[in-house]
Amino acid sequence: MSQFNAKAFLADVPHLPGVYRMYDANQAIIYVGKAKDLKKRLASYFRSQVASKKIEALVGNIHHIDTTITHSETEALLLEHNYIKQHQPKYNVLLRDDKSYPYLLLTKHQHPRLTAFRGSKKVAGEYFGPYPNVSAVRESLNLLQKIFPIRQCEDNYYKNRSRPCLQHQIGRCLAPCVTGYCSQQEYDNQVKWVRLFLQGKDSQVIDYLMQKMEIAASELDFETAARFRDQIQSVRAVQEKQFVANQRLDDLDIISIAYQSGLACAHILFIRQGKVLGNRAYFPKVPSHTDLTELADTFIGQFYLQLNQHRSIPNQIILDQPLTESNALAQLLTEQAGHKVTIITNHVRGDKSRYLALAQTNARAALSLQLKQSTTIHKRYDALKILLKLPTIKRMECFDISHTMGSQTVASCVVFDENGPLKSDYRRFNIEGITGGDDYAGMEQALVKRYDKPLPIEKIPDIIFIDGGKGQLNRALQVFEKLTVAWDKHKPLLIGVAKGAERKAGLETLIIGRLKKEIHLPIDSPALHLIQHIRDESHHHAISGHRKKRQKAFVESGLESIAGVGAKRRQALLKYLGGMQGVKSATLAEIESVPGISKTLAGVIFDTLHNS
């Protein structure tokens, strides 16, 4: 129980805006908050009548408090969310998803490039989005390339072409990289139509194309007219599939928050240029006894204010929960976005009301599904605890090895907590310096890389699964015996998961720890299902890493054997000629044009690739 002297502390706290950080006895930040008046806000935690069980638990763990005075409440709001992002305090609502949204980017070049983009908007050009996920933006990009044949290639590839690439041959690019294949006006028209299409002005695009088709037909240029006709049909087909909200609607995000049985879901509907671009559900980590207003405050702040996210902030944010600081938050978002941002939490009417109802339906459905999945995971955890006679299992890790005939070996480590896969903690390890195919040595190297270093208490697993039989488990046990670390290396229970006859799921044998006790579980065992889940995750993670490594080796292997072609020259060849296929199909003159490649070396490269 905390022995914090609140009275002595509060005596020196000023009546000013700022941020406060609460620490436990281990010097870990357990809560971050902001206040218009620090003294009043902090005093509220130490009243005789505690506001909630959450506050009671928080106050009971306070060892000391730090404060930072700010110029304004708005500045405090931004600083609060930066601290939450940095320290992930135990008693704050935490937004787990840490990825920025993808956009479509139309660059500012003589011949603009259309490409998918994620990250800081430092590249000059027009950004369209955000799209809810990478799949959505790739689908849109693929569709647009079929309708409007403008380039999508990297600048280095574009600048070094002497003949059109495959994209031109299949009708997906006008080949502006090579003189004589399309005029500047023709290319500019395609760019204009792409821009209008992405702005939601489909009808204008069709009108332009109709005019062009009629002019071509009147001039008896039926081939060109047919091309415009095909474009019109493609745009109309897209119109039929797209979910059009209302052309008069502003850019807006519509957010519904649902909360049940300790789980929360924030469902966001993205509307841009009158079109619903998509939706996305978030499941923030919520401390016990958190009320909906605090949940809404923290989620909205973290979602839009975490500076490394590069969020697209719309003109309006519509929310089905009240906010305690909606005016201050709107002011801060306006400053961040460079345009006026309004936050609406009541009196939503018309189309906006209907879309809010849609977001609410989706939030409830997503939360219901998450609760069912969570219940299943918890039941499986309980079954595993009973099987292994463990009082608690907070963290499990599983390792697997993947290679092709001993080459490009990769080890994977996946992590599960009580809520299932913790993908942000997944890791892969490149295994080097071992005899090809020696899985024992590969596993040893992976375990040393993972555990032979300082680990915080919360990162020490309760169970480590090794995908393999007694031999793999023995090697893992030897690794742990040799570890010289400050953390308790005897805490994790090591378990080998040996594949059954014919490697069929359900016939696995568990080999438990140092006693090597063998357990065969029935095929319908919830504990077995959990073990299969984490084992399969590790297997897939290892295979995907191995495939990437193998592909990279395949791309580079054709050049590695050529004398005089080191890493830098190899990289230049691949970069300027568009990958290994581009290098192999390049002419001698094209190879000579690559920076750093002499005429003599170009001849050697050309002869080697064409004679091999």
Curated annotation (Swiss-Prot):
GO molecular function terms here?
A: DNA binding; excinuclease ABC activity
Superkingdom of this protein's organism: Bacteria
Keyword DNA damage found:
yes
- The primary location reported for this protein is cytoplasm
**Any single GO CC term annotated in Swiss-Prot or TrEMBL for this entry:** excinuclease repair complex
Keyword list (alphabetical) reads: Cytoplasm, DNA damage, DNA excision, DNA repair, Excision nuclease, SOS response
Q: Where in the cell is it found?
A: Cytoplasm
Q: Which GO terms describe its biological process?
A: nucleotide-excision repair; SOS response
Say yes or no: keyword Ion transport present. no
Gene3D superfamilies annotated for this entry?
Answer: 5' to 3' exonuclease, C-terminal subdomain (1.10.150.20), GIY-YIG endonuclease (3.40.1440.10), UVR domain (4.10.860.10), UvrC, RNAse H endonuclease domain (3.30.420.340)
What would be one Pfam family of this protein? GIY-YIG
Q: How does it assemble?
A: Interacts with UvrB in an incision complex.
Query: PANTHER family attached here?
Result: UVRABC SYSTEM PROTEIN C, UVRC/OXIDOREDUCTASE
> What family does this belong to?
Belongs to the UvrC family.
The molecule here is called UvrABC system protein C
**What gene is it encoded by?**
uvrC
